[in-house]
Amino acid sequence: MAVQYETKATNVGGRKGHVHTDDNAINVDVLPPQQADGKATNPEQLFAAGYASCFNGAFDLILKQNKVRDAEPEVTLTVRLEDDPDAESPKLSVDIHAKVKNVLSQEDAEKYLQDAHDFCPYSKATRGNIDVNLNVEVVE
């Protein structure tokens, strides 16, 4: 299998530490969400940013493959860190909310969103591991 891309991130100090990528494009302090100070990020925000970007890229590709012009897709991804009744450690859940223009019907928009979910590498990586709720809104 050919590798299309590889990146590295290094953390020191865990959830109360610092993380950077090998190219320093990301170079930030990390704090748990409960200790947010407005300057540091947290793993959940980093996951949400990556997943939202990846998913919107997949959604845009699916829309273009289906000849939807000027769709201007927008994806907002909500990540929750929540209690897991089956384990001592918490778990993640995700809501993916998309907005799209110039789609003929809500039914088409939902199909394209599901196709994006099937295609997105983040969705593939999390499938069966976390709860993911999909929602799409057709806007003018």
From Swiss-Prot:
Q: Which InterPro entries match?
A: KH_dom-like_a/b (IPR015946), OHR (IPR019953), OsmC/Ohr_fam (IPR003718), OsmC/Ohrsf (IPR036102)
Please list the GO biological process terms of this entry: response to oxidative stress
Which SUPFAM superfamilies does the UniProt record give? OsmC-like (SSF82784)
**Superkingdom in the source lineage:** Bacteria
Q: Which Pfam families match?
A: OsmC
- NCBIfam families membership: organ_hyd_perox
Task: State the similarity comment.
Answer: Belongs to the OsmC/Ohr family.
Protein name (Swiss-Prot/TrEMBL): Organic hydroperoxide resistance protein-like 1
Species of origin: Staphylococcus epidermidis (strain ATCC 35984 / DSM 28319 / BCRC 17069 / CCUG 31568 / BM 3577 / RP62A)
